[in-house]
């Protein structure tokens, strides 16, 4: 007698529910997506105990035909695809025909629905079995209530998290729906407390304001890019506003919120050197493409997708964000808040950005955008100072020739303000005046940005600038590191450092790039070797980038080093020539502005 048997529909649905319905948030996602597929312009969500006790989704979509209502709860019954060809041109959020059957098998469900000019009906199901059907009066649309989720699967029930955690997961789902469908009025309430409410205006920025608040999204940039295959719209909250998680990056492909590591990384690469370490941006990335280029039939929950031209899309996202941010004047402004009642309390300061209009990035501009050449900077007028400390001779200042003194202020590129050097504060910050107010420049961060951009270019062309050493350097390698030297040697060779074995645990360096600091060659080589040994399976581009950042940090002016006016002037001239003068490679601000108006407010000259 054989031992293989066909499973009952009830058991098969429960097994399917294990993949489709993981938690209350899964139910909310599936039912809200069904409402959107039904053409709803308003969706209401009501929750009790974070959906574990009750979930009600109400919409004004086209509703079910009476004869389709029961069939909708049969596994793999759907109106969204008809044959295998439709599977490769999916334009709806749902298509598998599994969600309702899976949800009904692990809960108690009540469906109320009415189609235009049809009779309204109500169905009641218990563990997927129909227990009641009746006619009702209602407006066009659908209301679906799910109660006692997982009551018949105790194993799944015990793995649910706390009410707070489950509610956070639901809120995250609803936030992404709001961003993906800003033209739909979305209202969600949990035991009397509103979770989200959008106005359905069609403006993603309004949805962002509803979720994160108007103050957070001030200065949001909108950037667009196109190729033959993709249309891209990026909503980028100013780089100063960051979060501790990548979860605030929302990817929307053809109206579907998805998770994709490569696309998320492309967003972060676009913000490169503008974000502090461990911080992430708030961004909504919308992509429209031919359905043939995307496979959403990867997982029953439809969270993951496959893209046939993923690398091209990643490049488009990265370049669109990078070029958009590079065109902005991202100088934080210091604005005082209202003073506290305690007169001795110090006034708090907030930062904000001034965002300029963003031009659309066409396919040509994304791939062939010429980096504008900055105008040569002249010298600023230097007011006399009563006390100028002598410079520290150990400071490694740029080697560029110093232009002659003139009475003109610093002439810079279109993004960087014209500045007059006033002096130095605490031997760490350069104080400047400009047309709009007063500026403070972090001298270490400023030179770090200058050197980073220089080193990055130099590392990209090591073979063009190499020199033989008259006295080669010898380095001893720890036994633990010797095992990785076969991986490290190609990286060092690609940045211009030629190492040869010189004993069981020694290597000799005979060639180095000509631009290495002549008095710090040995130290620089050791630092680059250490940087390579610290990495695990790193590619050449990443190594060059990390090495440029490391060297820029270690070779730049430190805090508490006095500079004379000529050094400060030259530092600002060189900073103005960089591609992104407003942050150091680690994402910290280089320059901060106090506007004239805010200074007058601090001195109570204006109200």
Swiss-Prot record:
Gene3D superfamilies: 3.30.230.10, Histidine kinase-like ATPase, C-terminal domain, MutL, C-terminal domain, dimerisation subdomain, MutL, C-terminal domain, regulatory subdomain. Pfam families: DNA_mis_repair, HATPase_c_3, MutL_C. Belongs to the DNA mismatch repair MutL/HexB family. Residues 397-407 have a biased composition (Acidic residues). One of its GO terms (biological process) is mismatch repair. The keyword DNA repair applies. The keyword DNA damage applies. This protein is involved in the repair of mismatches in DNA. It is required for dam-dependent methyl-directed DNA mismatch repair. May act as a 'molecular matchmaker', a protein that promotes the formation of a stable complex between two or more DNA-binding proteins in an ATP-dependent manner without itself being part of a final effector complex. Coiled coil: none annotated. Residues 374-411 are annotated as: Disordered. Keywords: DNA damage, DNA repair. The gene is mutL. It comes from Exiguobacterium sibiricum (strain DSM 17290 / CCUG 55495 / CIP 109462 / JCM 13490 / 255-15). GO terms for cellular component: mismatch repair complex. It comes from the Bacteria. GO terms for molecular function: ATP binding; ATP hydrolysis activity; ATP-dependent DNA damage sensor activity; mismatched DNA binding. This is DNA mismatch repair protein MutL. Transmembrane segments: none annotated.
């Amino acid at each position: 007698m054989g031992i293989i048997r066909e499973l009952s529909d009830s058991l098969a649905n429960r097994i399917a529910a294990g993949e489709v319905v993981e938690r209350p948030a899964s139910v909310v996602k599936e039912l809200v997506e069904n409402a959107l597929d039904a053409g709803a312009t308003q969706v209401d969500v009501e929750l009790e105990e974070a959906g574990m006790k009750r979930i009600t989704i109400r919409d004004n979509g086209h509703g079910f035909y009476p004869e389709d209502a029961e069939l909708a709860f049969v596994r793999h019954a759907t109106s969204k695809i008809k044959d295998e060809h439709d599977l490769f041109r999916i334009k709806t959020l749902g298509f598998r025909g599994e969600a309702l059957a899976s949800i009904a098998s692990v809960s108690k469900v009540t469906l109320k629905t009415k189609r235009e000019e049809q009779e309204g009906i109500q169905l009641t199901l218990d563990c997927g079995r129909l227990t009641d059907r009746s006619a009702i009066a209602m407006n066009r649309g659908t209301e679906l209530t799910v109660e006692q989720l997982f009551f018949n699967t105790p194993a799944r029930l015990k793995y649910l998290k706390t009410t707070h955690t489950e509610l956070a997961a639901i809120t995250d789902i609803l936030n992404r729906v709001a961003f993906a469908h800003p033209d739909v009025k979305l209202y969600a309430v949990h035991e009397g407390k509103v979770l989200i409410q959008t106005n359905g205006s069609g403006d993603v920025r309004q949805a962002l304001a509803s979720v994160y608040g108007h103050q957070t999204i001030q200065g949001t940039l909108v950037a667009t890019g196109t190729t033959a295959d993709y249309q891209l719209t990026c909503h980028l909250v100013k780089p100063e506003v960051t979060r501790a998680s990548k979860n605030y990056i929302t990817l929307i492909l053809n109206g579907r919120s998805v998770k994709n590591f490569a696309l998320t990384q492309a967003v972060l690469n676009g913000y490169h050197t503008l974000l502090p370490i461990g911080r992430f941006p708030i961004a909504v990335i919308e992509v429209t493409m031919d359905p043939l280029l995307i496979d959403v039939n990867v997982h029953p929950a439809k969270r993951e997708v496959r893209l046939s031209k993923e690398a091209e899309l990643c490049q488009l996202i990265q370049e669109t964000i990078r070029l958009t941010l590079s065109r902005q004047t991202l100088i934080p402004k210091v604005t005082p808040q209202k003073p506290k009642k305690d007169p001795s309390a110090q006034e708090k300061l907030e930062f904000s950005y001034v965002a300029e209009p963003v031009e659309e990035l066409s396919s040509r501009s994304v791939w062939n955008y010429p980096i504008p050449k900055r105008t040569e900077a002249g010298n600023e007028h230097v007011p006399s100072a009563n006390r100028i400390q002598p410079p520290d001779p150990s400071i490694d200042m740029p080697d560029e020739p110093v232009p002659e003194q003139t009475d003109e202020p610093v002439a810079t590129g279109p993004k960087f303000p014209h500045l007059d050097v006033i002096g130095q504060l605490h031997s760490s910050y350069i104080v400047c005046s400009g047309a709009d107010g007063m500026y403070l420049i972090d001298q270490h961060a400023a030179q770090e940005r200058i050197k980073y951009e220089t080193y990055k270019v130099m590392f990209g062309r090591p073979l063009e600038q190499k020199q033989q050493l008259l006295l080669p350097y010898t380095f001893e390698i720890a036994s633990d590191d010797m095992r990785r030297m076969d991986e490290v040697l190609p990286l060092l060779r690609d940045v211009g450092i030629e190492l040869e074995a010189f004993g069981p645990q020694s290597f000799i360096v005979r060639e180095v790039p000509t631009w290495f600091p002549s008095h710090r060659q040995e130290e620089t080589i050791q630092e680059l070797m250490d940087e390579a040994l610290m990495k695990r399976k790193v590619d050449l581009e990443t190594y060059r980038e990390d090495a440029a950042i490391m060297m820029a940090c270690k070779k730049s002016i430190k805090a508490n080093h006095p500079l004379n006016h000529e050094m400060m002037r030259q530092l600002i001239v060189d900073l103005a020539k960089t591609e992104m003068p407003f942050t150091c490679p680690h994402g910290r601000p280089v320059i901060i502005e106090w506007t004239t108006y805010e200074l007058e407010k601090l001195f109570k000259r204006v109200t």
